[in-house]
Amino acid sequence: MTEATPHNHAFDRAIALTAAGPNLFKGNVDDSFQNMVGPFGGVTAAILLNGALQHPERIGEPISLTINFAGPVQLGDFELEAIPLRTNRSTQHWLLLQKQNGEVVTSGTAFFATRRETWSEQQHDMPAAPAADSLPRVERGERNWFRNYDFRYVSGLFDPNRSDGNPEDAHSETLLWTRDNPPRPLDFASLTALGDVFAPRIFHRRQRFTPAGTVSLTHYFHADTDQLARAGDRHLLGQARATRMHNNYSDQIAHLWSDDGQLLLTTTQVAYFKE
């Protein structure tokens, strides 16, 4: 098998940007990460973050990222404005705007900072789970983007064709191992996308498809570049759940840990659903 390294991996091709002027990049959306409506939201979020990561004025590393999916992203070319709104001694605030045909399709803000060594503590431990290699990979072909990820479910598999006689689950929680497929060394861009691999919580709660999608997400990065490098291309353990689904909208809270138990990402999002 050909080794997948950054730049020849499908993910890196999907988030690739070309500088086109001050605070401006250009890119292209193909169908390799296509979802129900437009591309997988995680790769769109990674594209916007990449604009800040590639910017010549960037300082520090990502601490938080908020993405708002304003409208459908179409196949084809786009422009990305990555604007450093304010740069302080060790912090930086960003405005990110993805545009197609002159209209904003995705907006975002990001907070970067230079981390200083301090006292640290992790209060949310990784749940107990069988090793990733002991679980079968779930092959899913409903959407193009599924092929780009390795999913190994511990619990909470969404299966609309289940035959256990239960039409619904009692909760919305999912616990799974996941990573890029083929494996790719973890970095901030790929962690951004992995933070959005969880299907809408209403799918899991009710075990059936319904029109649904993320409207806004916020990632909190708990790791630095060195910690991500230590995670390598191994699986991450992800846990996601909803706290309330009400009148067309649902939240989701999720976490991703490295296989040695380090919490790398906390993410929250709001999704719409229709009936």
Language-model segments: residues:
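Terminal targeting signals and extreme-terminal segments of soluble enzymes
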Residues: 1-275
